[in-house]
């Protein structure tokens, strides 16, 4: 499904499979074309095989976002098995309700701008997002989780607050890991104004890369966040390198 300006779902059921589904493991050519820049996943498809996409308007060169491209889920049930991003938007994304089960060879949820999960004061069940397989699970420039339950399995970063065409990652493969938090790894140098904020809800991350990776700051104000990180040279929490910080004022981490 592709919308030029805005995609909104208020109810109903969607079951989507694109190209070879989440089992895709190589480059392909042809089709509708790509989109914005690469994200470090060298095994991703070169065609547009996203599950749901709100593109937005770009300049004539196709490189500078101008308006629109918002994706909003207020309710309903979404099941996606995609070779490219399962949910993707060029503008802002709001996952405020509904149930989403996503499997992908690339990003589970990707926003080129702000990504909001749940409502302020919302319950822990709304929305429900289960990313069973992904390269990176949740990606946006500014990520805020207010409520709901999010479960992520990723072969790179679980949550990634980065630019719209971020190029981090090593294309690792991995699943649920054993053991504790482990030490902080080296990884790629990063810095910026991107943010990742947890105000409520439940977050479960199983990542072979960094569990929670922000090129800017990470803030914990409430909710429950559980991270299992399995890949060498990475860490459960990773913020930017230029006067950025991880701050805790509430919740359980």
Q: How should each PLM-predicted stretch be described?
A:
Residues 1-253:
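A composition-driven surface/loop motif
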